[in-house]
C-alpha cells in the first residue's frame, strides 16, 4: 500500500502542486518571479559556482533524459549494449554530477558564510540550496554505488515507471526492485519539485525573450 502511494499517487500530487503553485505564484507575486541576483555583493565565488553548477546540471538533465525517457529498446536497435550504455553513463554522468555538486558547495558556502550575502538571504534561499545539494549528492552517491560493471540498470525499472506516469498509467510494481539509494534520490526530487514554485527556482521559466528584440542600452560617460 505504501509503495502504491509513493510511486503511483505521489507523482501526481507533486505535479499538481508544481503546476498549481507556479500559476498561483505568477498571479500573486510577479515581482518576486526573479533569481534575485546578488552579483553586486560578490562576484568571484558566484561566477565559479554558478558556472560549474549550471553546466554540470545541464549535462545531468541530458543524461536523465537519455536514460529515463528513451526506452532501452532504442539503444538495442542502435547496437548499444547494456554494458556499453553503462560505461557511457558513468563516464559522462559522474564528472557532470561532481561538477554540479562542486558548484553547489561553492554557492552554498557563499550564501551561508559571506556576511553581506547572508543578510540578504531568505530562509527559502538557504533551504533551496541545501535541498539541491542534497539531491545532487544523493544522485552522485547512487552513481558511485552503481559503478560496478554489473550495476543496476534503471532503464528497465525507473525508466518505464516514469514513462507510465507521464502516460497516466502508473505502475508502482516497477519500483519494487529498485535499490534504496535510487528511491531516496527520487523522493528528494519530490521535495524539490513541491517547493520549487515557492522559491527563487521559478526564475528557470523566466526567459528574457524581449532582450532579443529590444533596442540597445547606450551608456555615456560624464564629460
From Swiss-Prot:
Membrane topology label: Multi-pass membrane protein
A GO biological process held by the record: anaerobic electron transport chain
Swiss-Prot/TrEMBL cofactor(s): heme
Location(s) in or outside the cell: Cell membrane
Binding-site residues, heme b 2: 64, 185
Cofactor annotation comment: Binds 2 heme groups per subunit. Heme 1, called the proximal or heme Bp in, is located at the cytoplasmic interface, heme 2, called the distal or heme Bd, is located at the periplasmic interface. Electrons are transferred from the periplasmic to the cytoplasmic heme.
InterPro entries linked: Heme-iron_electron_transfer, NarG-like_domain, NarG-like_sf, Nitrate_red_gam
A Gene Ontology cellular-component term: plasma membrane
Residues the entry annotates as binding heme b 1: 54, 203
Keyword Transport: yes
EC number(s) recorded for this UniProt protein: 1.7.5.1
Record protein name field: Nitrate reductase gamma chain
Species in which this protein is naturally found: Bacillus subtilis (strain 168)
Lineage start: Bacteria, Bacillati, Bacillota, Bacilli, Bacillales
